[in-house]
Amino acid sequence: MHTTLTHYARCVFGDEYRTTPPCDRQHDEALFIEQLTFADADAILAMLRELCPTLVDGYLPVRIRNLSYRLVLLQKPNEPALMREAAASLYAQGPDWDDIAAELERRADALDAAA
């Protein structure tokens, strides 16, 4: 059984650092995305940090990482450190999202300046 979002992600996508435990549940990406969509920010961050500890590693697909950070920032919109972490992840995946990453950094800087 998938006891956490991290465990579910590990079953669906694998884990670069740990063996994927045996599991008799269905491993459909669409069902995982449904769970991810309604997960709380802390569960999503725990998954990202355990499965991709240095942002550029791990087996989570880029589309799942991007969606995960987007969902976290929707739940925690005023946290500059999370904005910068999301920006770093976007920069690490190539130039396609550099403009979005730069905007996240600008927003983080503005929040810091206002504090």
Language-model segments: what does each one mean?
Residues 17-22, 54-60, 73-76, 80, ...:
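Charged, low-complexity interaction regions
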Residues 27-38, 61-75, 98-109:
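Structural detector for internal amphipathic alpha-helices that build alpha-solenoid repeat scaffolds
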